[in-house]
C-alpha cells in the first residue's frame, strides 16, 4: 500500500489518529523501522562509526536497508567499520520468549551461580553462534572452574596463554578456553611441573 514495488522498504508510514505521528510534507506519519535506526545512529554516533550490531535476524532486511539509506543520504560507502551479529541464546533448546515464560536474566543466573560461572558459560560459545542456556551448561562450567582453581599454581600462571590473538580472531573465546583446557590437562598429567625440573 505504501510501496511502489514489493521489494521497496518504507521510509515514512502514515499514522492513524491514535498512533504516534508528526506532520510532514507527505502527511501525518512516522518514520519506517529502518529509518528510525539510521536517524538515531547518525544523531548519537555520527554519519560513520566503528561498530554496529544486533541479532543475526537483523542482517536482512533491517541492517541492509539501514546501510542503503544511510549511505545514500550521506553520500558515503560505509555506515560502520564492523558489523557484529550475535547468535541466539535458547533455553533448553527452545527460543527464549516472554510469552513462553522461559526467560532467564543474568541476575537470576547469578543468584544460583557465581558471576565467573555465568561469564564462562557465556564465553563458551562464540558470540555469533547459538548458545543453549540450561542448568547442565552452568553446572559443567562450575565444575571446570573448580578444577582450574584446584590445580592453579605459579607454574600454571607462567604458562597461561595470551588471549589477545584469539580475541582479534573475531572474538574467538571458545578457542582461547580450549587452550586453557589443554593447559590444565598438561598440569593434571604433570607435564608442566616436569618442564620446570
Q: At which residue positions do the language-model features occur?
A:
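C-terminal low-complexity, glycine/proline- and small-hydrophobic-enriched intrinsically disordered tails
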Residues: 162-197
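Alpha-helical recognition segments enriched in aromatics with Gly/Pro capping
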Residues: 1-143, 149-156
